[in-house]
């Protein structure tokens, strides 16, 4: 999934006035968590988040297509927090965290280290 598509999907869920660079910065927080779990280098945002009129470079996000709902759910929850809508934030945050946990569990299952066969009981 691309960064700007995740932002567009979240905007469809929660119309808002937050600038695209700020939304990209919010998504980079999640992307850093995912990169740390994968042992990959976290991507960096190549735009100043202070400049609300700056255009954001589109980049490929780390999670594959089967788990890309994590991004727009996470961003929607953070938009609820920004708008101080605590009732929506609680629900959306729980749903987003569950989606992220499922994606991380899937990644760990698919990318296990080879077992050396040494078991101690």
What are these regions (language model features)?
Residues 12-21, 66-68, 72-121:
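Short loop/turn elements at secondary-structure junctions
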Residues 1-59, 104-121:
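Conserved short "hinge" loops at termini or chain/domain junctions
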């Amino acid at each position: 999934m691309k960064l700007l598509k995740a932002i567009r999907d979240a905007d469809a869920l929660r119309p808002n006035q937050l600038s695209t660079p700020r939304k990209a910065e919010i998504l980079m927080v999640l992307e850093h968590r995912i990169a740390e779990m994968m042992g990959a280098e976290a991507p960096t945002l190549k735009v100043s988040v202070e400049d609300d009129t700056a255009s954001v470079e589109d980049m490929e996000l780390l999670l594959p297509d089967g788990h890309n709902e994590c991004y727009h759910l996470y961003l929607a929850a953070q938009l609820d927090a920004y708008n101080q809508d605590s009732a929506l934030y609680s629900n959306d945050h729980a749903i987003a965290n569950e989606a992220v946990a499922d994606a991380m569990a899937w990644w760990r299952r698919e990318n296990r280290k080879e077992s050396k066969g040494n078991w101690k009981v």
